[in-house]
Design a protein with these regions (language model features):
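Non-catalytic C-terminal accessory region of glycerolipid acyltransferases
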Residues: 94-207
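A secondary-structure boundary/capping signal
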Residues: 27, 64-65, 82, 112-114, ...
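Catalytic core of membrane glycerolipid acyltransferases/transacylases, capturing the structured
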Residues: 32-90, 98
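A generic secondary-structure micro-motif detector
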Residues: 2, 63-64, 88-89, 119-120, ...
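Residues at the C-termini of beta-strands that transition into short coil/loop
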Residues: 29, 66, 87, 145, ...
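Short amphipathic alpha-helical segments and helix-helix/interface helices
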Residues: 13, 52, 75, 130-134
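Membrane-anchoring hydrophobic helices of lipid-metabolizing enzymes
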Residues: 1-38, 47-51, 56, 80-82, ...
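Soluble or luminal CAZymes and related metallo-dependent hydrolases
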Residues: 4, 8, 91, 184, ...
Length: 207
């Protein structure tokens, strides 16, 4: 699994990012050291996957747009670092299955719940992929918000990374007694996004 390579890269990148960026991490609680969970984050820039990895002590796997894997070298590198491809704008069953396998194997994975980067800086409508994996695996979902404070066009502007408490299967509105439905997935996605939005409003006030 290239675990040693992942954590060696993580240590190097932490040093680089501390020199380049100003960022604050807010943790609502200590996250589990064992067992699987899903990190559901908003998506502002190409540095977001790096900030997710830096702020979690455990190894993190994440979905990345399929286009990034067209370059064999770069695609191979990010695969070693935990990325797996997802086709945006499509119901990518293979990516969902890969995510479920990782969660069932006790891993931690990240999903950018909006399905892509925002062009305006505002939050977008959540996609259902995170809710689908949470429903199928019963894994808790950790809402996370990355907020740029100040001038959003400044790539080195201060960031606040806000990591929330895990939302349980029941807190997401899922039930063992019912077959999953699109409405159920939409409601779970809304609950997750509501937390992300709450963090964003709090953290935008941080000057």
């Amino acid at each position: 699994e290239h675990k040693a390579f992942y954590f060696a890269c993580r240590a190097i990148v932490i040093c680089i990012f501390k020199l380049l960026y100003r960022y604050t991490v807010i943790r609502e609680c200590e996250l589990p050291k064992n067992g699987s969970y899903i990190i559901a984050s908003n998506h502002l820039s190409n540095t977001d996957p790096v900030f997710v990895g830096l702020t979690h002590k455990r190894r993190v796997y994440f979905m990345a747009k399929a286009e990034l894997f067209k370059n064999k070298f770069f695609g191979g590198l990010i695969k070693i670092l935990g990325a797996f491809p997802v086709t945006r704008g499509a119901n990518d069953g293979k990516a969902i299955a890969t995510g479920e396998d990782l969660i069932n194997d006790g891993k931690v994975m990240t999903i950018f719940i909006e399905g892509g980067r925002t062009k305006t800086g505002e939050l977008m409508r959540p996609r259902s992929g995170c809710a689908v994996i949470a429903r199928q695996t019963k894994a808790p979902v950790v809402p996370m918000c990355i907020t740029v404070v100040g001038n959003k066009k400044n790539i080195f502007a201060k960031r606040v990374i806000h990591i929330g408490k895990p939302l349980s299967y029941e807190e997401l509105g899922f039930s063992n007694d019912e077959e999953p439905s699109p409405r159920e997935y939409r409601e779970a996605s809304r609950i997750i996004m509501e937390q992300i939005s709450k963090f964003r409003e709090m953290d935008r006030k941080d000057k």
